[in-house]
Amino acid sequence: MVLMMGVPQHFALSTARDYWQLLKPRIMYLVVFTASTGMIMAPGTIHPLIGLVSALCIAMGSGAAGALNMWFDSDIDAVMSRTKTRPIPSGRISRAQALECGLALSLLSVFIMSLTVNYVSAILLACSIAFYAVVYTMVLKRRTPQNIVIGGIAGAFPPVIGWTSVTGIPSIESLLLFMIIFLWTPPHFWALSLLNRDEYKLAGIPMLSVYSVQSTKNHIMGYSLLLFIVALLPGLYVAETVLYEIIATSLGAVFLTHAYCLLKEVGEPSPKACMGLFSFSIYYLFLIFSAIALCS
């Protein structure tokens, strides 16, 4: 069977899968989920169709940032075993195609958001894309050990965008959601970077773990403590305060336990401790935002 003017079907499907991988779909799912929590927590109502369009625009914006990140970092991705099978270093998509895809989705997502939702949400979406693709990827990532801290701002935008899709303006509540993701990001990524620090060093990426294992552990513990505290604050604004505080305290205690176990290890960080924290942090973010949505 032949599709698309003589292009074989298996090739067309392969290309579609490659472009999908270019958009970093796992990050996209998380972004849409946290943005949806912002919409649910926000006071007032939003037309279901407008809410759907907003979520799709946020997903497109996330994919656009992912594509631009892979375009710029293709040289690094080719060196690291964790990323060398990505579409560009494996030769399945060219750098030019990735750039075109990223730019097109960036413009389209912001334009549709401004046209159908509101200008504030569109501006925040544009800032999120620019912060990840330009400030983090092009400026910070190869220059400072604090790259993931400052770069985490980009990933913290979605719940604020979701909130403003409903209200038209950010608020303290939406900024608390922002801070949860901002404080969650460093422990999440640093836990994994402890296992991959040799590859980061080879690729020339100045991750904190490349400079000091102990400092990385200390930073992870510090951010985990701050996350524990800040994650309790949405309880001041949700309808089911007691239930939320019980959930947030329980999740935070497990997170801190993983961080403490990693901190107290002597010598080389073990895969068990690093992956234990990294894996639980994914569940933590999903569960804490689920709790916020359910208790609102």
Curated annotation (Swiss-Prot):
Superkingdom to which the source organism belongs: Bacteria
GO molecular function, one term: protoheme IX farnesyltransferase activity
Catalytic activity: heme b + (2E,6E)-farnesyl diphosphate + H2O = Fe(II)-heme o + diphosphate
GO BP annotations, alphabetical order: heme O biosynthetic process
Membrane-spanning intervals of the chain: 27-47, 48-68, 98-118, 120-140, 148-168, 175-195, 219-239, 242-262, 274-294
A single cellular component GO annotation: plasma membrane
CDD domains linked to this entry: PT_UbiA_Cox10 (cd13957)
Compartment(s): Cell inner membrane
Membrane topology field: Multi-pass membrane protein
Keyword Glycosyltransferase belongs to the record: no
Pathway(s) where this gene product acts: Porphyrin-containing compound metabolism; heme O biosynthesis; heme O from protoheme: step 1/1
Record bears the keyword Transcription: no
EC numbers: 2.5.1.141
UniProtKB keywords: Cell inner membrane, Cell membrane, Heme biosynthesis, Membrane, Transferase, Transmembrane, Transmembrane helix
InterPro entries: Protohaem_IX_farnesylTrfase, UbiA_prenyltransferase, UbiA_prenylTrfase_CS, UbiA_sf
Extra information: Carbon 2 of the heme B porphyrin ring is defined according to the Fischer nomenclature.
Function: Converts heme B (protoheme IX) to heme O by substitution of the vinyl group on carbon 2 of heme B porphyrin ring with a hydroxyethyl farnesyl side group.
The family this protein is said to belong to: Belongs to the UbiA prenyltransferase family. Protoheme IX farnesyltransferase subfamily.
Protein name, entry field: Protoheme IX farnesyltransferase
Organism: Anaplasma phagocytophilum (strain HZ)
